[in-house]
């Protein structure tokens, strides 16, 4: 007796294709790597830099040098996990009108011997439908 293999071939191919997917796509809520040039990552990084400067007791602004690594997680919205390098600028903070991200990025750096670089990890929670971003975690050294 000969049995047809056709009905089994389709589901078998589908199973093989699913097994070859990256593991992050198979875990709901898992971390996924993101390109540091992704517009959503850039927006989260800008927000993180502004929040860092608002919360920091330092008398000078720090600007973004580069995003070292970016990951995201689907939660109620998106959570971005960013590793970034920040550098102390020559721009002093003044009371009244804090600088926005683009202004901070235009600040000059001090001479090489006086430069202070920070390695920071930020978690930014984005909920676009509420037009809200929140810095949920920050650590720099």
Curated annotation (Swiss-Prot):
A Gene Ontology cellular-component term: extracellular exosome
Listed PROSITE patterns: CYSTATIN
Compartmental location: Secreted
Pfam families, per database record: Cystatin
Signal peptide as annotated in the record: 1-26
Assigned protein family: Belongs to the cystatin family.
Protein name: Cystatin
């Amino acid at each position: 007796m000969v049995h047809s293999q056709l009905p089994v071939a389709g589901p078998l191919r589908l199973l093989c294709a699913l097994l070859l997917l990256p593991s992050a796509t198979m875990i709901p809520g898992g971390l996924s790597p993101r390109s540091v040039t992704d517009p959503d990552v850039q927006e989260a990084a800008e927000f993180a830099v502004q929040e860092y400067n608002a919360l920091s007791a330092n008398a000078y602004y720090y600007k973004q040098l580069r995003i070292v690594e970016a990951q995201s997680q689907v939660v109620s919205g998106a959570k971005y996990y960013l590793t970034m390098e920040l550098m102390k600028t020559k721009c002093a903070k003044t009371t009244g009108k804090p600088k926005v991200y683009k202004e901070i990025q235009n600040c000059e750096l001090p001479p090489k011997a006086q430069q202070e670089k920070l390695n920071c990890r930020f978690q930014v929670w984005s909920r676009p439908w509420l037009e809200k971003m929140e810095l949920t975690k920050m650590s720099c050294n």
